[in-house]
């Protein structure tokens, strides 16, 4: 394999599965770990109402993940199809379009959450004791939704290019920054 060649087109599937599985599993473990760290910090500093507030807001994290995966995996699949056809120009346009969609949808979600925050929190099950905590937490964290969405989608696009370790490194840096900012 040439150094600049994408391994997805030239290496055996068994080798690719091993090479892709380890960084992906590490990234998932890191993600789970920093969610646990968040809960520990919030529980110790605010208490059970703080933990309840983050749980009420959690569906919005899943929306971010869903949007990121939708655009990231879709863009990555089309990127790989184009690369398989030896059409790098169209492959680049799919990546560019995916990144644009990630950013645009991230901003739209952030604005929608800011505009409809209280009704959303009530819809997600916030009680009178928790609603103010949930709104405060979500108003702050929603500012980061565009970045989260671009990161999730971008890591799929990076992996499609065969840059597994770089994708994993980006996830690790995100987890470390998240922990420090807590």
Regions found by a protein language model. Name each.
Residues 1-24, 79-146:
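Short alpha-helical transmembrane segments in multi-pass integral membrane proteins
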Residues 10, 14-33, 37, 60-67, ...:
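Residue-level signal for short hydrophobic patches within transmembrane helices
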Residues 24, 28, 40, 44, ...:
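Transmembrane alpha-helix boundary and packing residues in multipass membrane permease domains
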Residues 36-39, 111, 119, 153-157, ...:
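Alpha-helical transmembrane segments of multipass membrane proteins
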Residues 42-62, 129-133:
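Interfacial/gating helices of multi-pass transporter permease domains
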Residues 51-111, 148-167:
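Small-residue-rich hydrophobic transmembrane alpha-helices
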Residues 113, 152, 166-182:
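Alpha-helical transmembrane segments of multi-pass membrane transporters
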């Amino acid at each position: 394999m040439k150094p600049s060649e994408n391994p997805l087109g030239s290496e055996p599937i068994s080798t690719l599965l091993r090479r892709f599985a380890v960084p992906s599993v590490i990234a998932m473990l890191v993600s789970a770990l920093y969610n646990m760290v968040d809960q520990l910090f919030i529980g110790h500093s605010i208490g059970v109402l703080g933990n309840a507030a983050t749980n009420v807001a959690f569906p919005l994290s899943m929306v971010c993940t869903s949007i990121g995966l939708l655009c990231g995996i879709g863009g990555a699949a089309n990127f790989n199809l184009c690369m398989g056809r030896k059409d790098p120009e169209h492959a680049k346009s799919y990546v560019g379009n995916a990144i644009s969609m990630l950013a645009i949808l991230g901003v739209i979600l952030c604005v929608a959450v800011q505009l409809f925050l209280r009704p959303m929190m009530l819809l997600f099950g916030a009680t009178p004791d928790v609603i103010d905590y949930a709104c405060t937490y979500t108003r702050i964290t929603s500012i980061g939704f565009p970045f989260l969405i671009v990161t999730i989608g971008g890591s799929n696009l990076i992996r499609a290019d065969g840059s597994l370790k770089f994708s994993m490194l980006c996830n690790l840096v995100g987890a470390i920054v998240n922990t420090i900012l807590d």
